[in-house]
């Protein structure tokens, strides 16, 4: 069965590029360039993985993470980040739901295609809730 991914990034070039890469590797990908619209359209128990950019206007990736987890506690979510600073910040703040996120759930930009596919496959197959 085809794995379904939701990708949210405020930069259309990024969503376009990553969507094409993932679809070329057999994934079905829905994209949004606005976190508020993504949240309104989110379907619980539909996606195998959600990929969120951290730095977005209106609602950043951390806030969107918390809102998705409120709707769908078992959602597997990872983050795109241009810097490791965000990982450290998030690790210290924790999420509003009292969980910390493992470093494996952060995907560093610029993206290496092979590493991206390996990391996403690992996350989707990981039985542990992050």
Provide a role label for each language-model segment.
Residues 9, 53, 81:
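Active-site residues of response regulator receiver
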Residues 12-30:
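Two-component/phosphorelay signaling modules centered on CheY-like receiver
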Residues 63, 84-107, 114, 118:
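Alpha4 helix (beta4-alpha4-beta5 surface) of REC/receiver domains from two-component response regulators
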Residues 31-49:
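Acidic, metal-coordinating helix/loop segments flanking the phosphotransfer/catalytic sites
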Residues 118-130:
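The C-terminal output helix
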Residues 43-45, 67-75, 98-101:
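Conserved phosphotransfer cores of two-component systems
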Residues 56:
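Receiver (REC) domain active-site loop signature in two-component systems and cognate sites
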